[in-house]
Amino acid sequence: MTDTKKGSRLFMILNCIALGIIAMNLTAPVHEATHLITQMIAGAKPIVLAFGCAGTIDPSANIDSPFWKVMYTGSAALMNIVIGFILLIILKKFKLGPLSRPLVLMTTMMHFSMGFGYFLRDFFLYDPNPGPDVQQGDWAKVYENFDGNLALRITMLMIGCIGILFVFYIAYRQAFHFISDNNDKNERNRVASAIYLFPYLVNAVVFTLVELNGPVAKDNINSFLIISPIINIFGMIGFFWGYMFVAHMVKPRKQNVYYFSPCAEKKLVLWIFAAALLAFDALFLCPGFYF
């Protein structure tokens, strides 16, 4: 590989890592802001908005409505799914550009992964006999309002499984818009590692570390060590399997649907913006804004 090609591949990877950081900031804070807004509508007094959590319910608010008790814990995952479908329509209807398309694709996958992921994993996280304030997971808390109804939990588990498989499907299908020769395994590996593997690995490590400065970690490190890896590592596993399917495991698509490769030019402003956003997360958003 020539130095020019090595440089182009490095720039493609760095650009996609930066886009992955931006995509995460278009996903997790939206999830938490939905919690916050729903809690306020329900009549509760929010305490904090942070990258990894939002607004503990004020017990004095005395929310009696079963509907709002469910909504303030379950609505954020639903919002992720709705946004995911909106972004998927944008992906299908518009060609976008060599930077905007990977960004929209990553953000779509993250919203779907977060939304459907809660349905899937909270089936297992639900504790029928939790201690005070230790029920883990948004939808585990929803199930608590229905006394852990098994039929509801199984239904949501199935929806979650289908949703995560849908993320795998999106990852596989959409990747070929960036691959000019579907039969070139090296190109498939190069593109899939840039748009899926490296952003996944960097985000999983970086956001787990920066969230160590967040309210959940400070309040209960044991809870954090359960929740954060589940969300950042296992919750976004669609990126890893997207890479594996495209580069190694699944026979490539016969039909060529190539638009263009992800941007392989040096985008210093993009890198600086992503680094500044990450610094903002670490210094301000992860510790949280208190009301």
Q: What are the functions of these language-model segments?
A:
Residues 1-10:
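Short, Lys/Arg-rich, polar N-terminal cytosolic tail immediately upstream
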Residues 12-18:
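Select transmembrane alpha-helical segments in multipass membrane proteins
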